[in-house]
């Protein structure tokens, strides 16, 4: 009854705009739980009002619930603690629009020793931190925090989730809305074990700060994947960084701006400027020729850097504008042996050097400057100037007459596909081609379309008819000798194998013959010394004959078998 009267008095004082604080504490019987207080405040009031309620049993800390009406400047929070266990307090805080204080909501489950869990949120226009933390009961897991921030705020926003049990370090997920300037990171840690946290950081467009490093809170390793403002966009040409009519050309890790034919890109003006062109071919030494046709490859970018650096250094004191690479082709090697011996390879690069429209440079002065620079260059070997009329396919030998490329006359067999296209190209073949007669129309290096024979055929002896290539030859105009070389090499290899086989057979037979002769000699010696002692015959008088000679004469002394008594056995009787 006393508590009810105190609560009524507190509400009455708040209603009339009193600035004093009223509180009521009610403690239930049993246990040692601390009191629970509930505080509230009416609009316009500057004092704090609270109500504390403590449940019976256990040793749970107090639970507090605080709230604040619009226009107030004090903190509002709501804390609820369940009975039993030793869980830390749980707090829930919220803030109305226009408030400048912190708002949070904390919920803690009963039992275990889990750290507190906090949930904080902030309305648009506030400048304080907003976070949400959720911690499961039991175990010894560190706190888990989730923070978020509305557009326009300048404080940090993070979200942390930690599972119960084990000794895993905290896991944090941070995000930031467009327009903020604070750090954004996302960290995820699995429950249990002692693995350090893994952090993923990202930054929204428009942010100006870099993601900060994450220090592991335990374990032996950490994994961090940063992304955002420090790495730049993946597509270098999206959005297009080139202004005006220029187009963006993307290389491996850089880009450049390319204008229409006869124009160069002025980076200081950020626009295309009309210029004077000087085409030519240079021969360069490169370490690798693979993927030079691919503009996005590393090899092409290295070649582009070498070419542009060479010409920028050569024409640094002139009104030089830009160098454009037209075509890259591999120069034919002198021999296969020299190609294997040389560490570098030669490539031919067709370029166009563009100067200012009112330049005083001529084709002769440009060639002279390049040849002088080649003497001190390490990778550029040669330069050949190309007549401007030949470059565009126009009639004439004077380059000065072909500067107005849209007004020049195309060569016979060449034509412009569009009046605004500067190049004259072959539209039709120079003569009719018939596929049944093994003919085809191809574009030559000079741009002219010509009717030639198909691969494996050639025009022989001035005959216009395509005939099949002789044995061993193939390809265009029968210039491929692969079959002939293969036939010759195969014949030589077969002959060598046959010679080796014959030599092996002869060697084996000679060894067998030597062995048979030795056996025959041993047999002859054995028969020469043989004596037939059992019959009394001997071959000594047979004149080296293997058959014994029989003696027909009467011997002078007849051998007496009883003469030698020692050789005969005696009877025992």
From Swiss-Prot:
Spell out which residues lie on the membrane's Extracellular side: 18-480
Q: Where is the SEA domain?
A: 274-391
Output compositional bias ranges, type Polar residues. 554-567
In what way does this protein cross or attach to the membrane? Single-pass type I membrane protein
Signal peptide extent:
1-17
In terms of PROSITE patterns, this protein maps to: EGF_2, EGF_3, SEA
This protein's source sits in the domain of life called: Eukaryota
Q: What is this protein called?
A: Mucin-13
Q: Which organism is it from?
A: Mus musculus (Mouse)
């Amino acid at each position: 009854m006393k508590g009810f009267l105190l609560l009524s008095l507190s509400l009455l004082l708040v209603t009339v705009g009193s600035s004093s604080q009223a509180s009521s504490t009610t403690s239930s019987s049993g246990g040692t739980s601390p009191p629970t207080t509930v505080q509230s405040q009416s609009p316009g009031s500057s004092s704090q009002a609270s109500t504390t309620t403590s449940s019976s049993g256990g040793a749970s800390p107090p639970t507090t619930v605080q709230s604040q009406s619009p226009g107030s400047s004090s903190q509002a929070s709501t804390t609820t603690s369940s009975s039993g266990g030793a869980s830390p307090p749980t707090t829930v805080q919220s803030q109305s629009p226009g408030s400048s204080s912190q708002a949070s909501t904390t919920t803690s489950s009963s039992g275990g020793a889990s750290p507190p869990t906090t949930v904080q949120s902030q309305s648009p226009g506030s400048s304080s931190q907003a976070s949400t933390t959720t911690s499961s009961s039991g175990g010894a897991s560190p706190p888990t925090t989730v923070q978020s921030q509305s557009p326009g705020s300048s404080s940090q926003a993070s979200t942390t989730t930690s599972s119960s049990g084990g000794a895993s370090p905290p896991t944090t997920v941070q995000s930031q809305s467009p327009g903020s300037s604070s750090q954004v990171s996302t960290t995820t840690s699995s429950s249990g074990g002692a693995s350090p946290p893994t952090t993923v950081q990202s930054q929204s467009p428009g942010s100006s700060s870099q993601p900060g490093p994450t220090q592991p809170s335990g374990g032996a390793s950490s994994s961090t994947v940063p992304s955002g403002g420090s790495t730049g966009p993946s597509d270098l040409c999206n959005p297009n960084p080139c202004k005006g009519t220029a187009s963006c050309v993307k290389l491996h890790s850089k880009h450049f701006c390319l204008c229409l034919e006869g124009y160069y890109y002025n980076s200081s003006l950020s626009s295309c400027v009309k210029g004077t062109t000087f085409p030519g071919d240079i021969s360069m030494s490169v370490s690798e020729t693979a993927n030079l046709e691919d503009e996005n490859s590393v090899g092409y970018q290295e070649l582009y850097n070498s070419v542009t650096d060479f010409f920028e250094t050569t024409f640094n004191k002139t009104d030089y504008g830009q160098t454009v690479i037209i075509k890259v082709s591999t120069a034919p090697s002198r021999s296969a042996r020299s190609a294997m011996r040389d560490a570098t390879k030669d490539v031919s690069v067709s370029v166009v050097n563009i100067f200012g429209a009112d330049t005083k440079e001529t084709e002769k002065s440009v060639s002279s400057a390049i040849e002088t620079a080649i003497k001190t260059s390490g990778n550029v070997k040669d330069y050949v100037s190309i007549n401007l009329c030949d470059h565009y396919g126009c009639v004439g030998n004077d380059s000065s007459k072909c500067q107005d490329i849209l007004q020049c006359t195309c060569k016979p067999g060449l034509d412009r596909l569009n009046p605004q296209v500067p190049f004259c190209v072959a539209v039709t073949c120079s003569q009719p081609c018939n596929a049944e007669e093994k003919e085809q129309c191809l574009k030559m290096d000079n741009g002219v379309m010509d009717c030639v024979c198909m691969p494996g055929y050639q025009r022989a002896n001035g005959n216009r008819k395509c005939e099949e290539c002789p044995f061993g030859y193939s390809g265009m105009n029968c210039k491929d000798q692969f079959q002939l070389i293969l036939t010759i090499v195969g014949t030589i290899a077969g002959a060598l194998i046959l010679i080796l086989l014959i030599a092996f057979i002869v060697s084996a037979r000679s060894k067998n013959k030597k062995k048979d002769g030795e056996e025959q000699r041993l047999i002859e010696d054995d028969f020469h010394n043989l004596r037939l002692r059992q019959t009394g015959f001997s071959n000594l008088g047979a004149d080296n004959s293997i058959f014994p000679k029989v003696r027909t004469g009467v011997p002078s002394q007849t051998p007496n078998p009883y003469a030698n008594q020692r050789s005969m056995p005696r009877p025992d009787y």
